[in-house]
A protein has these predicted regions:
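Short alpha-helix carrying the canonical HExxH Zn2+-binding catalytic motif
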Residues: 73-89
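Membrane-helix interface segments
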Residues: 3, 75, 92-96
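Multipass alpha-helical transmembrane domains of eukaryotic endomembrane proteins
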Residues: 66-73
Length: 140
């Protein structure tokens, strides 16, 4: 009975997070087609280690830098947990995740990377990143 409930709950979350899961599948196939990937099935989510820099979370998919795979450093551990924090945001916000977190986070990353003014600020002080850290239990 418990297994059946878990399957039903998983199906409901897949539907609740449908926009980001669909984008995650597309991104996965692009990476799988054009580069080597390491896939780790973690039950309710899939970690994909590839040529991406840093991390990206789309529904059930966490895309992480290949160098992070089996790397025990504290920085890598925090980055992986932080990315999983974004996955928790996706679970909470469902279809609103793309607008509330995804777009805002991408704009913040672009501003922080491209303009010196923004680099003077702590990257993780932005609301999307601070909340992901909090959900994942990451302390900086």
């Amino acid at each position: 009975m418990k297994k059946i409930l878990n399957y039903i709950l998983s199906a409901l979350f897949l539907i609740w997070e449908l926009p980001q899961n669909l984008i995650g599948v597309i991104v996965f196939y692009i990476y799988a087609t054009f580069s080597d990937v390491i896939v780790v099935d973690e039950g309710t989510s899939v970690s994909v280690y590839t040529s991406i820099k840093g991390g990206l979370s789309l529904g059930a998919f966490c895309f992480l830098q290949r160098g992070y795979y089996r790397n025990p450093s504290k920085y890598v551990e925090k980055t992986i947990l932080h990315t999983k924090g974004h996955s928790k945001q996706s679970r909470i916000l469902g279809p609103l995740y793309i607008i509330v977190i995804g777009v805002a986070s991408l704009i913040w990353k672009a501003l922080w990377t491209c303009f010196k003014y923004f680099r003077n600020k702590d990257y993780y002080s932005f609301y999307t990143e601070k909340w992901a850290d909090k959900l994942a239990g990451v302390e900086r």
